[in-house]
Regions:
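A short, basic N-terminal segment
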Residues: 1-56
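Mid-core helix/loop region of P-loop NTP-binding domains shared across ATPases and GTPases
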Residues: 2-7, 13, 99-111, 116-166, ...
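Walker A/P-loop nucleotide-binding motif
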Residues: 54-76
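C-terminal helical "lid" subdomain and adjoining coupling/linker elements of P-loop NTPases
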Residues: 59, 233, 242-303, 318-323, ...
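Conserved catalytic segments around the Walker B and adjacent sensor/switch elements
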Residues: 59, 82-99
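Short, hydrophobic-biased segments on the C-terminal half of alpha helices
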Residues: 76, 164, 357-361
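Hydrophobic residues on short alpha-helical segments
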Residues: 304-312
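Terminal-proximal interaction/regulatory segments of ATP-powered molecular machines
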Residues: 322-404
């Protein structure tokens, strides 16, 4: 036997269909748990599309891991299938706004995903103007489709509202002659609408839905529905209930629950355990928390991370001081002073105090930081305190990997 024969595991002793535990896996309807009402409401909003009529524009809110994207993708796929049965040509396009956050990136992604060989229209990755991308998109839509649903996932990550204006008013503005567009925006931020241009708000927010967090029972059911990702008999009885309880404590996040289950299996693999044991769940939860936060700050600027590092260091020092209350908040000036020290250590010029305030607001928008206003009386006036909502140890570890 050659050495290479010992390098790889030819038969996975833990997983039989690991894809069921991937976040981007779209399950069949029977595997979508606890969202029957939401799926029905969303389907009702876009139902006119199966007859070649304009679907309602929809905005979906809810915390991370509440099934928003999953249900929107499922309904979009079913609409295309049902429209085809009615003799209506339909398509759906998906944009990850965290990845394609500029207007040009987003419209290029949409045009590329709905383009077909029959159009003879070329959609390059780059090299043409935003206006040209739009012109080609409108041509493709009118040439190929009666109805198109466009899903903008993490819509709050878009740099501006320009593409929302273009899409929501394409028919009204005469950009499209026959094709009808429906937009489904998905956001983790319930206050996202407050940042919208009023004209966009009036046309995009025709229907709004809020997805509530899953409870422990629903999370348990979700993981049971995906447990055939594992080989028979490898999951100890307490694994799924334990993972469900941990995820329910963390705002009912199904994404985290599935991550924990997958990571627990991977820990069993790496330790050559014969079964996935309950003790692996706690280790898996720590890894899931780290990965979730790393994803949350993906794409943030160095100075955004320096500001967060300053608040994290203050939080860690406060925790070590037994006289300091838990969840201690810190004034902007204290955060700024430490931020300046970090900039000097990193050999970087510091930003202004005003810009650091803006960065702290951005962290608050992402629910990484909580801001509260206080009155210091006539002598001090009012001031803002910033409290880190994440585990400081997790933030410290992630920032250590991302700050060079």
């Amino acid at each position: 036997m050659s050495k290479s024969d010992d390098l790889f595991i030819r038969e996975d002793p833990i997983f039989v269909d690991k894809e069921l535990l991937e976040i981007n896996h779209l399950p069949e309807e029977g595997r979508i748990v606890g969202r029957g009402e939401e799926i029905g409401q969303l389907a009702n909003a876009v139902n006119p599309g199966i007859f070649g009529q304009s679907p309602s524009n929809v905005l979906i809110y809810g915390k991370t891991g509440t099934g928003k994207s999953l249900c929107a993708k499922y309904v979009s796929r079913r609409l295309v299938q049902t429209a085809d049965e009615e003799g209506v040509s339909a398509a759906h396009a998906y944009v990850d706004c965290a990845q394609d956050g500029t207007e040009t990136q987003a419209v290029q992604t949409i045009a590329s995903s709905v383009n077909t060989d029959e159009t003879d229209i070329y959609i390059p990755d780059k090299g043409i103007s935003t206006a040209t991308y739009y012109k080609r998109l409108w041509k493709i839509l009118d040439a190929e489709y009666d109805v198109v649903l466009i899903m903008l996932d993490e819509i709050d990550k878009l740099e501006d509202d320009d593409i929302l204006m273009q899409l929501s008013r394409a028919g009204e503005a005469g950009k499209l002659e026959s094709c009808k567009i429906g937009v489904i925006g998905v956001s983790n931020k319930i206050k996202y609408k407050d940042r919208m241009d009023e004209r966009v708000k009036s046309s995009l927010c025709e229907r709004e839905f809020v997805f509530p967090p899953y409870d422990a029972s629903q999370l348990n059911e979700i993981m049971v529905a995906r447990s055939d990702a594992f080989r028979d008999g490898v999951l100890d009885d307490g694994v799924i209930p334990r993972a469900a309880a941990l995820a329910a404590r963390e705002h009912g996040d199904a994404r985290k629950a599935i991550d924990i289950l997958r990571y627990a299996g991977e820990i069993a693999q790496s330790t050559e355990a014969e079964t996935v044991r309950e003790e692996f769940v706690t280790q898996a939860r720590e890894r899931a928390e780290t990965d979730r936060f790393r994803e949350l700050i993906r794409g943030s600027t160095p100075h955004s991370r320096y500001v967060l590092q300053a608040l994290t260091m203050l939080s860690i020092n406060a925790r070590e001081d037994e006289t300091t209350p838990d969840n201690q908040g810190f004034r902007t000036t204290r955060v700024y002073d430490l931020y300046e020290q970090i900039c000097r250590q990193e050999g970087s010029d510091s930003l202004s105090l005003r810009r650091v305030r803006d960065l702290l607001k951005e962290h608050a928008f992402l629910d990484i930081v909580e801001q509260s206003r206080h009155s210091g009386g006539s002598a001090e006036g009012s001031y803002t305190e910033h409290t880190l909502l994440e585990d400081p140890a997790v933030v410290k570890d992630v920032l250590a990997d991302t700050i060079e």
